[in-house]
Amino acid sequence: MKTGRTRPLRVFDILVPPWPPTVPHRIKLPRGKTNWFEFYSAITRNWNKLKGLKNCWQIWKDVQEIIRRIRKYQGESTVMQGPGNNDGAHPYATMAGKLDSKLLQALKVMEFEYMTPVQHRVLTELPSWRSDCLVQAKTGTGKTLAFLLPTLHCLLQGHSAPPRGQVAILIITPTRELAQQIAKSCDQLTSQLARPLECHIAVGGTARASALARFMKGAPSILVATPGRLKDYLSEPSTAEKLSNIQTLILDEADTMLESGFLADVKRILQLIPPKSTGWQGMCFSATVPPKVKDVVSVVLKPGYTSISTIEKNETPTHERVPQYHVLIPSVADTFTTLASLLNLEIKNSSKIIVFGVTANMVALFAAAFSQGLTPLKVFEIHSRLSQSARTKTTALFKEAATGIMFASDVIGRGMDFPNVDLVIQVGLPSNGEQYVHRVGRTARAGNDGRAIILLTEAESFFMKVNRHLPIQPHPQTDAINAGASSCADAVTKAMYSIGEETKQRAYSSYIGFFAGSGLLKQVRLDKPGLVQLANELAIQGMGCPEPPPMDKKVVGKMGLKGVPGFNYATGNDLNGDRPARPRGRPGNKTRDVLSPGAGQGDRRGSVSKNRGGRRGGGRGGRGGRGGKPRAA
C-alpha cells in the first residue's frame, strides 16, 4: 500500500477522529490542489479565518469531499485506525463470538472499526482474558480499551462476579485527568447494556464527602482511582468493604505513577486490598519497566504472567528524537517579555502549543497575561488550582482545538494525550530531568513531529550541565528572541496592568515557595535573602507591581524564611480582593532600588537601604511621608 506524508491533517482530527497517521495517494485531492501538503497548508492556514473568506463554502465542500473519500478508502483498504498503524487491519468484527456482543455494538457506536496493535495483541495473545499480564505500550496507543474490553467481557459473562454493589474492577491511574478519560471510555463501552454498569471515580481535587456518599449509596462495578484518594477510601472499614471482592486490579501508566512519588501509596493499597492469594487478576500497563515497576509487578502479577510489548526494542524514545532547544533569559524580570517574543516567533510554524510553568499560580498568571492580546491564538489554562469540572472542560476543549496555547502545570505533564501538539515550552526549572522528559513527551505523539524549548535564566542553566544526556541545544534564534523581548515590553506592561493584585501575589508567593521547598537554592547559587530579592525583581520589574506583593507572616514561616529580610508583610486587607494595580515602569527595566534585601525600609534621604524611614518619606519608607511606617522585616 502506498502512503503519502506522515503528518496528519489537523483539521481532520476534529472532523473524523481518529485520523490515520498516513495519507494515501489513492485519495484524489480537490480541484486545483496538486499535493497533500498544499491542501493541508491551505486548510490550516485559513481555518480560523474561514468566516471572513469569500471562498469559505468551497473550502468547506472540499473538506467534506475529502472526508467522504477517506471513509470510503478506510472501508476498502487494510489501513488500521489508531496510532502505530502499518501492520495491516484487524477489525473488531473478527472478535464476533469471542467478545461480548454488547461491547461490539458499543464499539460500532463509538465508530471504532479496527483494533490498534496493543488492543489486538492483548485480545489475541492472552491465554485467557483472566490471565495476569504486563503490557508495554505508549500513551495514546489505545491502552484503555486494551484493558477495559477483556475485563468488562469477563464481568458481563459472570466469571466470578462479586455481589452487586461491590467493586469488581479496580483501576489505579496517576492523574485525575486520566481517571476521567478511563471512566468516560468505560461508560461508552457499557452504554449498550440493558442496565449499564456503574463506573465511579475516586480522585483528589474533588469534593470528597459527596463523591464518597455516591460511592457508598451506588452499586459500583468499576472504580477508577488515583493512589492518594484510593488509599483514603481504603482506610475506612465501611468503604474498604466495597473493595473486598475485587476480581481485577489494573495499574495504568505504572511507570509514571511509581516514578512520580506514588510508590508508597501503591504499596500501602496492596496491603489494604484482599491478598493476591484470593485469586484476583493483575494487569500492569507501562511504557517502561524501571526497578520500581518491577518491585510492584512481583506483588500484582503471579509468576508465569504473560508479557506483551508493542514498543520496538530499537525504537528511539520520544525525548531523544524531538528537537530540543534552550533560550537563556537575561534576567528573571525578562521572563514575560521573552516568552512573548518567543511565542511571536514560534507561532509562525506552530499552531498548537503547551507552555509549562513552575507552579500552578505562575501558570494562572501566564494565562491571565497572554489572554490580554499578547498572542493571536486562543489561550487555555489548566492547573491544580482550578476546579475539577473546569479542568475537565479545558482538557476536552484543547483536545478538540485545531490551534491554541495551553498554559499548564504538571497535572497534564504525564500521561495525557493531546492530539497534534507541535511545540512544548517550559518556563523555568523543572524539578528534575525526569519531569522535563515527561513534559517533552506531550509533543511528537502518534507519529507526528514536534519541538521543545526551555526558557531558563543564566543561574538556572546548570540544568543542561546536570542533564548532559538530554539533546538540548541553544536556540538558533536566541539573539532575535531577546531582541524582540524589548519590543514586547509595552504590550506586557499593558497586560499586567489589567491583572488583579491577588493573582500576582499568589504567583509571587508560589515562586518563592517553589525554590524554598525544592532544594534548588544551592544549585542556582542563592541564599534565602537572595531568593527574596530575586522574587521582588520578578514582581516589580516583571509583573509590574509597585512594590513587593504582601506576604502573610505565617506563610513565610512555613516556607522556612522567618526573619529573612526583603518581605513586604501584609497588614489589614492587603491580601483581600483582586484589584488591578497600575504597574510602575516597564517589565524588564529596573525602576526602583526596592529589590535589595532591605526593601521598603527607607533612609533619611528616602532611599531603601537602611532600617528606618526617612524624614521626607522618599521611596517607600519615610515615616512622615507617603511611605508611612516600614512594613518590611
From Swiss-Prot:
Group of enzyme by EC: hydrolase
Compartment(s): Mitochondrion matrix
Transit peptide as recorded in UniProt: 1-32
InterPro entries on file: DEAD/DEAH_box_helicase_dom (IPR011545), Helicase_ATP-bd (IPR014001), Helicase_C-like (IPR001650), P-loop_NTPase (IPR027417)
Residues that bind ATP: P83, G84, N85, N86, D87, G88, A89, H90
Listed GO MF terms: ATP binding; ATP hydrolysis activity; RNA binding; RNA helicase activity
Top-level taxon of the source organism: Eukaryota
Record-linked Gene3D superfamilies: P-loop containing nucleotide triphosphate hydrolases (3.40.50.300)
Motif Q motif per UniProt: ranges: 38-66
Region entry Disordered, spans: 567-633
Catalysis performed (reactions): ATP + H2O = ADP + phosphate + H(+)
E.C. code: 3.6.4.13
Residues annotated as domain Helicase C-terminal: 262-429
Motif (DEAD box): 195-198
Predominant localisation class: mitochondrion
Keywords from the UniProt entry: ATP-binding, Helicase, Hydrolase, Mitochondrion, mRNA processing, mRNA splicing, Nucleotide-binding, RNA-binding, Transit peptide, Translation regulation
A GO cellular-component term linked to this record: mitochondrial matrix
Chain's role: ATP-dependent RNA helicase required for mitochondrial splicing of group I and II introns. Also required for efficient mitochondrial translation.
Domain notes: The Q motif is unique to and characteristic of the DEAD box family of RNA helicases and controls ATP binding and hydrolysis.
Stated family: Belongs to the DEAD box helicase family. DDX18/HAS1 subfamily.
Protein name listed in UniProt: ATP-dependent RNA helicase mss116, mitochondrial
Gene designation per UniProt: mss116
